[in-house]
From Swiss-Prot:
HAMAP family noted in UniProt: Ribosomal_uL15 (MF_01341)
The keyword Zinc-finger appears for this protein: no
Lineage: Bacteria, Pseudomonadati, Pseudomonadota, Alphaproteobacteria, Rhodobacterales
InterPro entries: Ribosomal_uL15, Ribosomal_uL15/eL18, Ribosomal_uL15/eL18_sf, Ribosomal_uL15_bac-type, Ribosomal_uL15_CS
Ranges annotated as biased composition (Gly residues): 21-35
Name of this chain's protein: Large ribosomal subunit protein uL15
Family to which this protein belongs: Belongs to the universal ribosomal protein uL15 family.
Organism: Dinoroseobacter shibae (strain DSM 16493 / NCIMB 14021 / DFL 12)
Assembly notes: Part of the 50S ribosomal subunit.
Amino acid sequence: MKLNELRDNPGATKPRKRVGRGPGSGMGKTGGRGIKGQKSRSGVAIKGFEGGQMPLYQRLPKRGFNMRNRKKFAVVNLGLIQKFIEAGKLDAGQPITEDALLASGLIRRKLDGVRVLAKGEITTKIDLTVTGASKSAIDAVEKAGGSVAVTSAQAAA
């Protein structure tokens, strides 16, 4: 077999349809778009427009709201903290603060604080000082012999 003998399987590719190339092509003049109207013009149809029928996004009820002054936390899981300790990027002997997490590269920015969640396992005894932590994360750290100091009461829940 040579490179110039390579071919697609018969029927694997369809020939391109050249529309608007005269009546003999079967797709001449209007090119399969029908006559006049918004959809016959160039440009795409309006997104969400359903031909005058009440669109889906308007048929469904409005729900919820966005809190204007919502606090955003950098989320850290216990499994990742353990991984960074094993890799030597975090020192378990020192108290682990938000600044230590930032310096180690575990979080990119502090935002409104750091919140620790319990995904993964922690086996090393650590002393955490963070803005918030889930109850299960606090339990897991204390079970490993460590302690968690939560600096903000709102974020603890």
